Each structure stands twice: as structure tokens, then as C-alpha cells.
Amino acid sequence: MDEPVRLVGFTLNLQPYFRPMATLLPARGHAPVLDASVWLAPNATVVGEVHMGAESTVWFSAVVRGDVARIQIGRRVNIQDGAVIHGTFVQSQTVLEDDVSIGHNAIVHGAHVKHSALIGMGSVVMDHVIVGEGAVVAAGAVVLAGTTIEDGELWAGVPAKCRGQVSDSLREHLSQTAARYVEYAGWFQDDGAPGE
């Protein structure tokens, strides 16, 4: 909002007055615990027993709901726009290890996603799923409850099935994704606006 809003007949500069903030809420006696370097989009929501590691990011309209089960998020995890992270009461907590990427509008519900894995856009990963290190769940896939995806596997379809191994080129791309999202978050950092 660095530029003033121009309306018919007058100009309105909202920068000094409008400071959108993410929603952080306690639930069942637990408040989110975030490393100081975590970046949250202004309309992201983080609720309850959520622990987030250094340089992790939660993007626009994403929801991380630790109200019914603990959510543990490692370092440099990116939870992209519209994604939902949740669990099932008394049954399944969610763990996202370091350098995990959760694609736009994906749902991860009570699963354990290991280091450097990618959950593709619009996919659904259900309770008690284990996604191996460097594995990929393709866009739009539905991984049924209790499934184990081995390290480096590529799963796709509804219901999702193993379609082979992650290619070398995709593995290289994934190795850079977490660092890129840390960089992207830097583009939104406060630049010394009034009141800071």
C-alpha cells in the first residue's frame, strides 16, 4: 500500500493507518509458538498448539489449525496460499519436517511429511500418512489414510498410487524451493513504515 488510493475527486493514502496482520489464536490452553524469523501473510491463520521453526512461511489464506491436535513444523517449511494443515482429535497430529513445501490449496490432515518432500497443489493427504524424504505427491492427488510413501517416490491420482521415482531434475528443483520461499517472504518484510 505504498501508493495512495485514487478515487474520483480525492486521494487517500492508507499506508500510515492500515497494517494487516495474520490471525494467531490460542485453543485449549495452547498458543502458537513461532520462531522470530517466521513470516505469516496478513490473512494467514495459525491456531492452537502449533510450533514453527526458523524461516518457515504461511502464505495468503492458508490455515494451520492446531486446535484438536499438535502441529510441528520444521525449518524453511512453506505453506502456500489456501493450504490447510490440521489433524484429528486424539488420533493424529501433523508433522512437517525441514524444507517441506505444501502447495497452493493442498490439505494435509494428520500426516507426517518428511524432509524436502512436496505436497502438490490441490492435493489431499489424510490421517496417518507418511510421506518419505524427497517424495512428491502430485497436484490433485488424494493420498488415503494410513498410506506410506517411501523416500523419493512420486505419487499421483485419485486415489494416489506410486508412479515411479522423482526424477533428478525435479529433485534439483525441489532442493531450491524452500530457499526460494524464504527469499519471497523477504519481499514482504516491513521497510520501516511509520510506527515501527
What are these regions (language model features)?
Residues 1-20:
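N-terminal amphipathic/basic-hydrophobic helices that include classical n-h-c signal peptides
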Residues 17-34, 67-88, 92-96, 104-196:
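Glycine-rich hexapeptide-repeat left-handed beta-helix
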Residues 22-58:
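N-terminal segments that cap or nucleate solenoid repeat domains
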Residues 101:
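Short proline/glycine- and basic residue-enriched helix-capping loop/turn segments at helix->loop/beta transitions
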